[in-house]
UniProtKB/Swiss-Prot annotation:
Source organism of this protein record: Bos taurus
MF-aspect GO terms: heme binding; iron ion binding; oxidoreductase activity; sterol 14-demethylase activity
Name of encoding gene: CYP51A1
Disulfide bonds: none
PTM description: Ubiquitinated by MARCHF6, leading to proteasomal degradation.
Regulation: Inhibited by azalanstat. Inhibited by azole antifungal agents ketoconazole, itraconazole and fluconazole.
Cofactor(s) the protein needs: heme
Highest taxon of source: Eukaryota
Entry's family note: Belongs to the cytochrome P450 family.
Name of the molecule in the record: Lanosterol 14-alpha demethylase
Length: 502
């Protein structure tokens, strides 16, 4: 045991020299890691890290790290995609490694990923992975804070409100919101595209998904509350205890309380008025669980928060990245604009849902953006039972992961995998031929219920933007990926625009 502790201390000491470069904050971080490493090494020594595998079972290849506890956290944090692709080349589709005291097993490629997407919740559990992130943001009693059977009922209620009849109403709402938002942009200039689209996504989603009462209260102060609440989706929130007095945690918790109060008032007003409005708020107010119990006001408010914020990330990042892909390829951008005239009419009348469905090139551009820049790099579950895949057995306690980003650019599956080519979907591609090669919205029991709304939202916003402006890169700069956030956003996303001549 003493040898183990000495080994851990020696390695951590070397790591401090290499990693911190004398930086005090970094040294304190490593010191904390060392303390945690002692606990980790003790558990390792006494054999309590995981139950033994069945006799004859073979563990996945393990990528050894010289740094206890932290493991590969630094290398993975700097370049996660390259790390996973290199590991795939060296070890194959299934491999394990340690970060911050947890063992992660990745399943790369469609065949290996099938284990996660086809699994039952009692074998690969989602709540134990995501609850510490989502519960402080959405609230108690919804999403990953409840048993999976209850969550599935809640998703079914929300999905019933995300229907074509509502989508038909949403198109005109989103178009009007978009036109109003871009009035402030003027004739030409340079703007932060990601910030702008994040704001617009909140405005349009709130109007469509929350109803006019809640949208009418969405001013700058409330928008900041949403931003503070959204700040709860962070690496710190996932890694650290929620009771720590961090500024971001305090802002998140205050925003949660204030937004809930806004929702409570809107819900109470709707209930008291007896007015029946055909929107998702009304759908939830009239929904019941299988046992006949109606949703409480707190559950309705939490589900509305979850519906907005879960979709906001997908739509804002995808919309922004697509803008830069179109700005880089002006020929493609012009084709998308001409498609507007071909499908909708030369005079570009107000958009309709049926026209939106026929904008096939724009649809393929969204699909290709989601392939190369999926908002979420990793989908994760906690192994509760031994699971076999590709001849290996994954022990209980492993964090089992699939990376849409890696699967969607795997060289064994995709031709010209790094090229932005929307026309690849006109022919046979892994997206249609391999079940889990293309999974930006997940698959199986946890597939995103907001996928169709996201397409309606993004297509309507970009149809309107293409009618208003031409877009260009600034001095040829195409944003790199910001891997420091949970959602992989564009770095320095400034774009140049000029109003189209009529």
């Amino acid at each position: 045991m003493l040898d183990l502790l000495q080994a851990g201390g020696s390695v951590l000491g070397q790591a401090m020299e290499q990693v911190t470069g004398g930086n005090l904050a970094s040294m304190l971080l490593i010191a904390c890691a060392f303390t945690l490493s002692l606990v980790y090494l003790f558990r390792l020594a006494v054999g309590h890290l995981a139950p033994p595998l069945p006799t004859g079972a073979k563990s996945p290849p393990y990528i050894v790290s010289p740094i206890p506890f932290l493991g590969h956290a630094i290398a993975f944090g700097k370049s996660p995609i390259e790390f996973l692709e290199d590991a795939y080349e060296k070890y194959g589709p299934v491999f394990s490694f340690t970060m911050v005291g947890k063992t992660f097993t990745y399943l790369l490629g469609s065949e290996a990923a099938a284990l996660l997407f086809n699994s039952k919740n009692e074998d690969l559990n989602a709540e134990e992975v995501y609850s510490r992130l989502t519960t402080p943001v959405f609230g108690k009693g919804v999403a990953y804070d409840v048993p999976n059977t209850v969550f599935l009922e809640q998703k079914k209620m929300l999905k019933s409100g995300l229907n074509i009849a509502h989508f038909r109403q949403h198109v005109s709402i989103i178009e009007k919101e978009t036109k109003e938002y871009f009035k402030s942009w003027g004739e030409s200039g340079e703007k932060n595209l990601f910030e702008a689209l994040s704001e617009l996504i909140i405005l349009t989603a709130s109007h469509c998904l929350h109803g006019k009462e809640i949208r009418s209260q969405l001013n700058e102060k409330v928008a900041q509350l949403y931003a503070d609440l959204d700040g709860g989706f962070s690496h710190a929130a996932w890694l650290l205890p929620g009771w720590l007095p961090l500024p971001s945690f305090r802002r998140r918790d205050r925003a949660h309380r204030e937004i809930k109060n806004i929702f409570y008032k809107a819900i109470q007003k709707r209930r008291e008025s007896g007015e029946k409005i055909d929107d998702i708020l009304q759908t939830l107010l009239e929904s019941t669980y299988k046992d006949g119990r109606p949703l409480t006001d707190d559950e309705v408010a939490g589900m509305l928060i979850g519906l907005l914020l879960a979709g906001q990330h997908t739509s804002s990042t995808t919309s922004a990245w697509m803008g830069f892909f179109l700005a880089r390829d002006k020929t493609l951008q012009e084709k998308c604009f001409l498609e507007q005239k071909t499908v909708c009419g030369e005079n570009l009348p107000p958009l309709t849902y049926d026209q939106l469905k026929d904008l096939n090139l724009l649809d393929r551009c969204i699909k290709e953006t989601l392939r190369l820049r999926p908002p979420i790099m990793t989908m994760m579950r906690l192994a509760k039972t031994p699971l076999t895949v590709a001849g290996y057995t994954i022990p209980p306690g492993h964090q089992v992961c699939v990376s849409p980003t890696v699967n969607q650019r795997l060289k064994d599956s995709w031709v010209e995998r790094l090229d932005f080519n929307p026309d690849r979907y006109l022919e046979d591609s892994p997206a249609s031929g391999e079940k889990f090669a293309y999974v930006p919205f997940g698959a199986g029991r946890h597939r995103c219920i907001g996928e169709n709304f996201a397409y309606v939202q993004i297509k309507t916003i970009w149809s309107t933007m293409l009618r208003l402006y031409e877009f260009d890169l600034i001095d040829g700069y195409f944003p790199t990926v910001n891997y420091t956030t949970m959602i992989h956003t564009p770095e320095k996303p400034i774009i140049r625009y000029k109003r189209r001549s009529k």
